Regions:
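Hydrophobic alpha-helical transmembrane segments
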Residues: 1-288
Length: 288
């Protein structure tokens, strides 16, 4: 047991360092983002391979989608940066809650992967469900945003269904919503496949682990909808006549589209992640 734990810690350090360095080289993360990314990834992988695969699937798929169609996104996104270049605040906004949960879990389990089973441990089931929901939300929101910006469909504000310009906070498209569900599906599938190799679930408990896939799919969509609802109501969107873009800050040249200036994009992301994490945790307690 001690040997496998030490091996996992070593793997976590080497793999996280390699991924963070590569991400910095390819401009997926800036310097501060790469440093924070290394810490967060190392914690997840050291806590359990299932948790490690969740953050890695989220990171790699979101990074690829961020770079897809960059020329078009450059004309839409006010904060566009070549390659994405997420900083430490963005990394933390998309990983802080899950990092806290996996640290609690590894403290309880000693790094042993456990099945989702409330009869054995409701606490472990609830906390693990929260981690799954966290990354289903993160992946769903990212896929939805990145694919939605490239959609040929007309974005509509989620609160009024009024047609709005691309880049408006709280706007949704059919393609974006389907992408969110697909993103959640990928998270659930990755967790389940790795779990088959790392857990000793048996009987009905083993079969029930497959329910993670539809749960994560639903939470990918749900998390994206929550993010859009918050974006449309507590995050300001306006059209700048000078930059010819939708922006998130008031100015003399900006005409309001929607939302109050209460939270910025990182705040909206963190709030939607927290709500989806709690929702998934409760769902897992009832289902498993």
């Amino acid at each position: 047991m001690m040997g496998s734990t030490l091996l996992r810690i070593l793997v976590s350090l080497v793999l996280s360092l390699a991924i963070a360095a590569r991400a910095y080289k390819h401009k997926s993360l800036n310097r501060s983002g790469a440093m924070m990314g290394f810490v967060v990834m190392a914690i997840h992988i050291a806590a359990g391979y299932r948790f490690g695969v969740l953050i890695l699937v989220f990171f790699f798929t979101s990074s690829k989608l961020t770079k897809f169609g960059q020329e078009k996104k450059r004309t839409i996104d006010e904060d566009f940066k070549e390659g994405g270049q997420r900083n430490w605040i963005q990394v933390l906004a998309n990983s802080a809650i899950a990092t806290v949960l996996v640290v609690i879990l590894v403290t309880i389990t000693g790094g042993e992967d456990r099945c989702l089973d409330t009869k054995n441990s409701a606490l472990i089931t609830g906390l693990t469900g929260g981690v799954i929901g966290h990354y289903a939300c993160c992946n769903g929101d990212t896929w939805s945003s990145e694919i939605g910006m490239l959609s040929k469909g007309q974005p509509r504000l989620i609160t009024t269904f009024k047609p709005v310009k691309k880049g408006t906070n709280g706007a949704v498209t059919i393609e974006g919503l389907l992408a969110a569900a697909a993103a959640g599906f990928v998270i659930g599938l990755a967790y389940t496949l790795v779990g088959l190799l790392t857990t000793g679930c048996a009987g009905d408990v083993a079969w029930k682990q497959l329910l993670v896939v539809p749960i994560a799919t639903a939470m990918g969509l749900c998390g994206s909808l929550i993010d859009s609802l918050l974006g449309a109501t507590v995050q300001f969107s306006g059209y700048c006549s000078l930059r010819k873009k939708v922006v998130s800050k008031r100015a003399p040249s900006v005409t309001k589209i929607s939302g109050m200036n209460i939270l910025d994009n990182n705040g909206v992301n963190a709030a939607s992640i927290l709500l989806t994490t709690l929702l998934t945790s409760v769902a897992c307690l009832y289902i498993f």
